[in-house]
């Protein structure tokens, strides 16, 4: 896999009617691991399994990328949304790598964590409390769409996928016409 990070800039656009006028956040999503790795198999007829992949290298890479991005853009706080209370190993690794990068390289930035369920509730209650969200692949996909809904829909939020040597820019998700 080429290394890839996704960033979505979520803010209120002029001329787009929304419930919220105070949204200004960035979503940083790890884009190659997690359940979207495509590692699935049929254990026995009628029973299938999907494997969630998390590597220390991938988790540290996206953590560094997110903190460097936040620092360069003069953002103040990174919030990691996770489910480490249930997925202790995979989400635990993601969370621990982000905390390690914060403590060792970017102590000047604020750092908080939230369980994904509670984080989504907080997002719809008051999105202004967030600045940069750092998420693993599946959570980032879902939360990007949720946040697009806060500011007018999928077609109004720009997204970028950054690889080692190339980048792709697009709307956060496809839209149905």
Residue ranges: model-predicted function:
Residues 47-114:
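Glycine-rich phosphate/diphosphate-binding loop of Rossmann-like nucleotide-binding domains
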Residues 8-49, 138:
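N-terminal glycine-rich phosphate/adenylate-binding segment common to multiple enzyme folds
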Residues 20-24, 32, 73-76, 106-109, ...:
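Short coil/turn connectors at secondary-structure junctions
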Residues 16-21, 43, 71-72, 103-105, ...:
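Solvent-exposed alpha-helices and their adjacent loops that cap or buttress functional pockets
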């Amino acid at each position: 896999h080429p290394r890839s990070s996704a960033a979505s800039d979520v803010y209120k656009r002029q001329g787009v009617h929304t419930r919220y006028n105070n949204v200004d956040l960035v979503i940083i999503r790890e884009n190659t691991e997690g359940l979207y790795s495509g590692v699935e198999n049929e254990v026995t007829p009628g029973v299938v399994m999907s494997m969630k992949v998390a590597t220390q290298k991938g988790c540290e890479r996206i953590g560094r990328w997110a903190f460097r991005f936040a620092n360069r853009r003069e953002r103040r706080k990174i919030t990691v949304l996770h489910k480490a209370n249930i997925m202790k190993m995979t989400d635990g690794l993601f969370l621990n790598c982000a905390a390690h990068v914060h403590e060792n390289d970017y102590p000047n930035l604020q750092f908080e964590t939230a369980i994904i369920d509670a984080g989504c509730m907080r997002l719809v209650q008051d999105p202004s409390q967030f600045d940069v969200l750092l998420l693993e692949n599946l959570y980032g996909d879902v939360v990007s769409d949720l946040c697009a809904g806060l500011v007018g829909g999928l077609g109004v939020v720009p997204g970028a996928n950054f690889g080692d040597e190339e980048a792709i820019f697009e709307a956060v998700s496809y839209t149905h016409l």
